[in-house]
């Protein structure tokens, strides 16, 4: 099983709060090994966003990296 599918399968069984906790834990720990998992989550969300949501997300990203 590839990493992308493994991450998505694991997250499907989790609640919104559990996923939020996972994201916060990765951010707080600065564990670079978990970065691919965040990328999978981002890609899954991005693929389902409208153009308006993508524009809004890009504003948040730009604010975060500036």
Swiss-Prot record:
Subcellular location: Spore core
Annotated keywords: Sporulation
Induction: Expressed only in the forespore compartment of sporulating cells.
Domain of life: Bacteria
Gene Ontology biological process terms in this record: asexual sporulation; sporulation resulting in formation of a cellular spore
Keyword DNA-binding: no
Keyword Metal-binding assigned: no
Family: Belongs to the SspI family.
NCBIfam families: SASP_sspI
HAMAP family the UniProt entry points to: SspI
Protein name: Small, acid-soluble spore protein I
The species this protein was found in: Caldanaerobacter subterraneus subsp. tengcongensis (strain DSM 15242 / JCM 11007 / NBRC 100824 / MB4)
Gene: sspI
């Amino acid at each position: 099983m590839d990493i992308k599918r493994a991450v998505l399968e694991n997250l499907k069984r989790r609640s919104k709060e559990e996923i939020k906790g996972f994201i916060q834990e990765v951010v707080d720990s600065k564990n670079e090994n978990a970065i691919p998992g965040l990328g999978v989550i981002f890609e899954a969300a991005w693929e389902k966003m409208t153009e308006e949501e993508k524009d809004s997300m890009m504003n948040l990203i730009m604010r975060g990296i500036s």
